[in-house]
Each structure stands twice: as structure tokens, then as C-alpha cells.
Amino acid sequence: MQVRQSIHSDHARQLDTAGLRREFLIEHIFDADACTMTYSHIDRIIVGGVMPVHQAVTVGEDVGKQLGVSYFLERRELGAINIGGAGVVSVDGERYAIGHEEAIYIGKGARDIRFTSVDPAKPARFYYNSAPAHTTFPTRKITAAEASPQTIGDDATSNRRTINKYIVPDVLPTCQLTMGLTKLAEGNLWNTMPCHTHERRMEVYFYFDMDEETAVFHMMGQPQETRHILVHNEQAVISPSWSIHSGVGTKRYTFIWGMVGENQVFSDMDHVKVSELR
């Protein structure tokens, strides 16, 4: 498990390219028949990927000492979205069939969590976020239809995109975790511009659905001290609450957003005008 410490905005603005990437970019998410984990001190979120190919993959079997618990979800909840082939998630013996672009929420207290693929030639690829939890809510599958797809933006500003809200209060209860998937329309390049911050929550963006020659310039930093990180396929960026989080790609792309913090109000944003950015 990799560990990323919190960082003050005054420190972040002094970093060079290598420093920004070291602190905020998660370059590697998926390994065959393995579970990856990056633990951020910012709101204690854990980010990673599970890609079962030839065998079932369990989550968090060896992190008890690092988290100070006897099992992974003893004091945590978890959300996962499948961006690969059909998969199955077993939670304490109960099986959930999770197809492409379907999701699962697993509540606090689940002990035995196993991920498998239906077809090893087309393995499932589960991207997950986990956050501290104070109580238990039921484990549940979320379909793409339940995510209530909403298309916003337009071609003139190159930001027409469809937002899918999988793990939000309107769909199911969680302690603090929210997750969703945003898909840009063909020929559109910008996400979240005009941009915003939200002092009450942190966020992680996971970029995917990109070919080898496609890249996203992820914008970050305080509105008057912006920086960028160049992101490639299946990489994630940690966004502290003081940072904007926006991006422009060389071609269209898709990304998963996950938030934890004080509240779960999707519209609770501190908007920043483009004219105010520096």
C-alpha cells in the first residue's frame, strides 16, 4: 500500500513537475490478479483497482496493521465501478453480478470481499474508493440506469458530457462516500470548466477510456496559482479541498470521480469564473 501525506497549498505551489506528480498523481491502478492501494492522508481516502483474471482477488487482507484494524472494512465503506468485462463480487458469501459500467457499494463491517471475472479473456476491472465510516449501510449493486444519466455542456464550449451518479444520496445511503462516472461526447475535450473548489470535500479523478496517444492536462492548484499534471490512460489524481480539478484532453475520455468529506451535496461547490483563474 502506497501512502500519500497531506500537503499545504503554500507548499504545493513551490513544487516542480516531478514534485506535483509525486504528491498527487497515482500512475498505476491495475495489476492482473491483484488489488492495488494508495492511502491518502487527505480525508483518509483509499484509492485502487482490482483486476481478477485467473483467480479470485480479495481486498485488504494484509492492511490490518497499517490501518490499525483487524480487517479492511471494520471501520470503512467501499464503492467500486467496473470499467471492464463482466464480474462477480462476493461479500460475506452473497454474490453480486457486476457488469460493465455497473457499480457496487459495500457497507462497513463486511469481512470477506472477493472479486472474480466471468471471462478471463475479458477480465473485470474494478476501480474503487474507500472512506472511513461510522455506521453500516446495506451492500448494494447499482446499475447504469439507476445512475440517472444527465447530459450537460455543449459542443460550442467543447464540454458536452454525461454525468452518471452511482453512489449519491438520491440512489442509496452511505456514510460519506460519493462516486460517479462522467463520459465526454465525441469531439469534446473539457471537463468541469468553468471550474470550482469545495472546501468541505476532497476529490479523486480517475481518467480512462483513452488510447495510448491520448493525454489529459489535469488542472489543479488554487484558482490564482494553477498548475497542471499530464495524465495518461487509467491514472488518477488526488485533489485536496483547496484545489480546482478540471481537465482538457487531446481527445475525448471518461473519468470517475469520488468524493469524501463534510457533506454529500453534489451541488455544494465554490465556483470560479474563468476570468478569475491565473
Curated annotation (Swiss-Prot):
Its pathway is: Glycan metabolism; pectin degradation; 2-dehydro-3-deoxy-D-gluconate from pectin: step 4/5
**Catalytic activity from the UniProt record:** 5-dehydro-4-deoxy-D-glucuronate = 3-deoxy-D-glycero-2,5-hexodiulosonate
Result of knocking out the encoding gene: Cells lacking this gene are unable to grow on polygalacturonate (PGA) or digalacturonate, but can grow on galacturonate.
What this protein needs as a cofactor is: Zn(2+)
Q: Which cysteines are joined by disulfide bonds?
A: none
What keywords were assigned to this record?
Isomerase, Metal-binding, Zinc
According to the UniProt entry, what is the EC number of this protein?
5.3.1.17
What GO molecular function terms would the record report? 4-deoxy-L-threo-5-hexosulose-uronate ketol-isomerase activity; zinc ion binding
InterPro entries found in the cross-reference section: KduI, KduI/IolB_isomerase, KduI_N, RmlC-like_jellyroll, RmlC_Cupin_sf
Q: What is a biological process (GO) this protein takes part in?
A: D-galacturonate catabolic process
Q: What induces it?
A: Induced by galacturonate and at a higher level by polygalacturonate. Is expressed under the control of KdgR, but is not controlled by PecS. Is repressed by glucose.
Binding of Zn(2+), residues: 196, 198, 203, 245
Q: What class of enzyme is it?
A: isomerase
**UniProt xrefs under Pfam families:** KduI
Which protein family is it in? Belongs to the KduI family.
Describe the task this protein carries out.
Answer: Catalyzes the isomerization of 5-dehydro-4-deoxy-D-glucuronate to 3-deoxy-D-glycero-2,5-hexodiulosonate.
What's the protein called, per UniProt? 4-deoxy-L-threo-5-hexosulose-uronate ketol-isomerase
Provenance organism = Dickeya dadantii (strain 3937)
- The gene for this chain is kduI
